[in-house]
Amino acid sequence: MQNIRNFSIIAHIDHGKSTLADRMLEFTNTVEKRKMKDQVLDQMELERERGITIKMQPVRMRYAHSNGPGPEEEYTLNLIDTPGHIDFSYEVSRALKAVEGAILLVDATQGVQAQTLTTLAMARELGLKIIPALNKIDSPLARVDEIKAEVVETLGCLPEDVLEVSGKTGSGVEELLEEVIKKIPAPKRELENEKDFRGLIFDFQYSDHKGIIVFVRVFDGEVKKNDKLVFSQAKEKFICLEAGIFSPEAVPKATLSAGEIGYIVTGIKKPGIASVGDTVLFANSNTQTLGGYMKPSPVVWASVYPESQDDFADLARALDKLQLTDSSFSYEEEASGLLGRGFRIGFLGTLHMEIFVERLHREFSVEVIVTTPSIMYDIKSKNGKTQRIYSPSLFPDFGDIESIQEPWVDIEVITPNDYMSPIMQLLFEHEAEQGDSDVFGDGRIKMHAQLPLRELMRGFFDKLKSVSAGYASVSYKIGEMRHADVARLDILVAEEIVPAFTKVVSKKRLEEEAQSSVEKLYKVLPRQMFVAKIQAQALGRIISSKTLSALKKDVTGHLYGGDITRKMKLREKQKKGKKKMKERGKVNIPQDIFLKMMKS
């Protein structure tokens, strides 16, 4: 155990964490040069396409290190690569509980970001040893001295404690690994009896052949093939079919011992048995369980329906399987008069939702209709009853509502001084209450504010990047519930409400949102064989309306000559047919239209 080091890398999105991990794998010969590719640890196709880490990924490296004049010693370095985006911070928190230290990686061209501070606070709370490092020092835009001063101020460390590396060229990687060995403590057993086994589940995945495969950090004892084990929470007993490590692919091992990070194949194929934060013990053991994780609460909700109701069972199976690889979303069945049976699903953010929908399509070939994302509201009706509403389409009629409460968020924005004015304007436009501001390093400022969660989800992140030329960053945490002056906005197509387009908006922006939604739908909705109105309705009245003209079909094209009477009869017949279609017709809305409106 003395020669094991377990660590993670804390970094904001796009600060080069995965690239640095690539260089570590290369330097330690964990991956052969001929097999090297960018983002080796990003296993999902989506991660590679988007250039972001979505799922954490553990890997074991071997590294020979000299402690002095004597012979070199071999060390086992277990790295857990983690996501940098705020929507996947739960993945990061789980990784941090399985390690003893973390590298705080800061982009030398960008500086310390707000989300990095949030993750750093989590690491410090867990008592992890922090090793600061500046990345991208080879960039001509690097401001090494300036950013190093920021890191020193943030951590309270010395300038010489901050290492300088380049994930691109590999410069400084050897020194960084040496620092990991010197400064991050070796793992320690917690139980007196060395034969008692305890493993913390920090992630799991599902295999059609092997069943549930749990990713574990072994805190005490050891486990091997054919050992009888139990999930302490579910009380489900099973036989260890295989134990092993990640290198970075799964490699079976005779035993998995205290201090190590690896996997256990359970053979269990039932959903809902394994859970992140559970402890794996020997069957019939009375050993105390390890402290688990606090499950995150969803931030946004959306209803998801199969494009065809014949595919409902396929969607249900897909959700069961997805939850075996992503335990951070929650779902329950619901029904809509227009869209049929579906599920209301809670996500950690809008990016989490986008990735989820994309995975449904790619991994399970399920085409879905997704409603406009929403947050939760507490609504008190005039009859005195209070209910928590997650779907805008379930909002009561405006005349029945006594009051509405919504969650607010506390946000922290870090920005160069030059962009403070447009950011203050952006905060004003999103109904924020501005708080204190503090100087943060040389030429930057840290701003505090509070605003409604619905306003944060209304494109705030993208707008912040836009007004600050990409230099500002933001982190947030859910705060208190407050009074909400909002209304339900329905979109009607051919005089029928389409629940998927219903949203809750501020009364101040009701007309603006109504016109914007109608205009966008008008532009993307294919024309029908009959005239169809697109309308926005709120507070009992139509606020905006536009008419989609009918698709013209030449019913006289097959006629020759100048029989005008025959042509007139055919056109009159077509007119009557379109009138009937309009009276009874439902507009066919393709699935991609729902996705386009969801992003509006």
PLM feature spans:
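Structural and coupling elements of P-loop NTPases
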Residues: M1-S600
